[in-house]
């Protein structure tokens, strides 16, 4: 048991080392896009399933409240939170439409969709991306493995943050770190701090 625990730490560390080489440019570009979106008076919508739904909520909470510095709230909405809406859409239409219908109602040109799926193949996240594109939104995707079908929907205006791993747990761990990097860069770009203080 102890060895399995130690192995999990070691694998997580190695995946983060690999990601530290592969992901900084994508994360920086995504953060720049998000800053531009927010400065333009737009918002960020986020979606995912299971642990990725938790990540979407974590991201929106950090923007709506604060990350590490005192600042005004920033507009972000996790589309996985409204159980009445989600269950109504799933019951009346399809589970694949639980995010896309919300995006058709809430998404505006200039908004960003943060689409999260460890496999890149979640049907409802793919439909969300299609809806976002139809609303002239840009997309930041957080994926892993080979990027799945989500990778094929992205244009040069979008950003893919693809974790270099095939292990779901390791991908989720790096997704959380990437989200924290996004929040940190958004905060320090919009609200520069005196590092000497």
From Swiss-Prot:
GO biological process: carbohydrate metabolic process; D-glycero-D-manno-heptose 7-phosphate biosynthetic process
Cited InterPro entries: GmhA/DiaA, Phosphoheptose_Isoase, SIS_dom, SIS_dom_sf, SIS_GmhA/DiaA_subfam
Span of domain SIS: 34-196
Cofactor binding mode and count: Binds 1 zinc ion per subunit.
EC numbers for this chain: 5.3.1.28
Binding residues for substrate: 49-51, 62, 91-92, 117-119, 122, 172
Cofactor: Zn(2+)
UniProt protein name: Phosphoheptose isomerase
Species for this entry: Shewanella halifaxensis (strain HAW-EB4)
